[in-house]
């Protein structure tokens, strides 16, 4: 519950608000006084972000701070930190009304000790929900949710500047509500209930809703947009929207900035909250260059929207990235590689913030004794980029077809076969038919023309039985495509 006086170790609410806005006010005032250091003087991404008046954050596992290279980068390159797992429900309330804040407090202490803004993640999420909570129903479940939100937000009051109050409320495809325990037991109203409880517990923290696959303008982001618009119209306390941005190399939505702007126009802040850009491994110079360009696009999209607060990457090093465990054969998604070497994305982010990186001598990576595998080959004409988000026995595929020939394609059919018995259950921006493992995808009425060098995109939901290997061969209008 709200306190009338701050508890020991908590600054007064007004003091916390002033501290939270210091960086952006300082950036504005210093520029106004014309004494700001030139952008070229930035030697770290933190300095570049500070100079741009934006956050640049990372997801922290406090157990890794004992690793010298990890801590050195964490200390110097970021001005915001978010707990990767330490503030989620299973970590903070493993049994009913028995709270455990040890790991979360370590993250909060680290933020305070290093002068970083602390971002809270997450109060209500259907994943990592303890079994005891899943077994509750009706009013008991709602009371447990409100109690959890209240106790956790109250504990970190004065330390957390912003909270992901509700995470991943919408499903993929047409953007219906996520079929979660919260939705099943409490219906649509649970989101509003959670936000009102969070505001009551901490009246000055910014309250955010956070989701994935909403970076472009699509059915899912439209559902999120409609909810935010409704909340703002009715005075529900929602201050910001987080765009997770777990992206795939070469597939940054072209309307990312426009999407951020339309949410900002509703009167909320926006931020990029969990950025990583994965590729098929092993990496190579071409993939890393494309990844760098993609990181730059994402940061530039934020920089072009006044109410975009900043960018957070979901980890520091590829060594500890979540990606390979969830997407076998993919990875290399972060700004530092598994040996803590800066990748080309580092300089790209620096430039997007408006600074120029300071060159640092590097030792060339030894040439591997085993040649890098060559991507699946085919005649110059088409390329397919295959991206998947998967869970238990389901998945969502997002597919980009690129016309690499010198002539336009007018009407297209893409064919491939599933290697592991997968089944398509729902498709969009296309017409999909399946016979056994063979899948045929035909264009929708609006995306049948692909100019030379242009792309068409479609997606579908599917089911699998535990193995979800990606197709290895595609043909467009009978011509084999490369896979990249």
Swiss-Prot record:
Catalytic activity line of the entry: Hydrolysis of (1->4)-beta-D-glucosidic linkages in cellulose and cellotetraose, releasing cellobiose from the non-reducing ends of the chains; Endohydrolysis of (1->4)-beta-D-xylosidic linkages in xylans
Signal peptide: 1-41
Gene3D superfamilies, per database record: 2.60.40.290, Glycosidases
GO molecular function: cellulose 1,4-beta-cellobiosidase activity; endo-1,4-beta-xylanase activity; polysaccharide binding
UniProt-annotated stretches for the region Disordered: 357-377
EC number(s) given by UniProt: 3.2.1.91, 3.2.1.8
Residues covered by the GH10 domain: 42-352
Catalytic residues (UniProt): 168, 274
S-S pairs: 208-240, 302-308, 382-481
Comp. bias (Pro residues): 358-376
Ranges for domain CBM2: 375-484
Key words, A-Z: Carbohydrate metabolism, Cellulose degradation, Disulfide bond, Glycosidase, Hydrolase, Multifunctional enzyme, Polysaccharide degradation, Repeat, Signal, Xylan degradation
Pfam family, any one: Glyco_hydro_10
GO process terms (BP): cellulose catabolic process; xylan catabolic process
InterPro entries linked: CBD2 (IPR001919), CBM2/CBM3_carb-bd_dom_sf (IPR008965), CBM2_carb-bd_dom_sf (IPR012291), CBM2_CS (IPR018366), GH10 (IPR044846), GH10_AS (IPR031158), GH10_dom (IPR001000), Glycoside_hydrolase_SF (IPR017853)
UniProt region (Linker ('hinge') (Pro-Thr box)), positions on chain: 357-376
Family: Belongs to the glycosyl hydrolase 10 (cellulase F) family.
Role according to the record: Hydrolyzes both cellulose and xylan. Also has weak endoglucanase activity. The biological conversion of cellulose to glucose generally requires three types of hydrolytic enzymes: (1) Endoglucanases which cut internal beta-1,4-glucosidic bonds; (2) Exocellobiohydrolases that cut the disaccharide cellobiose from the non-reducing end of the cellulose polymer chain; (3) Beta-1,4-glucosidases which hydrolyze the cellobiose and other short cello-oligosaccharides to glucose.
PANTHER family per the UniProt record, alphabetical: BETA-XYLANASE, GLYCOSYL HYDROLASE
Other information: The linker region (also termed 'hinge') may be a potential site for proteolysis.
Identification of the protein by name: Exoglucanase/xylanase
Taxonomic source organism: Cellulomonas fimi
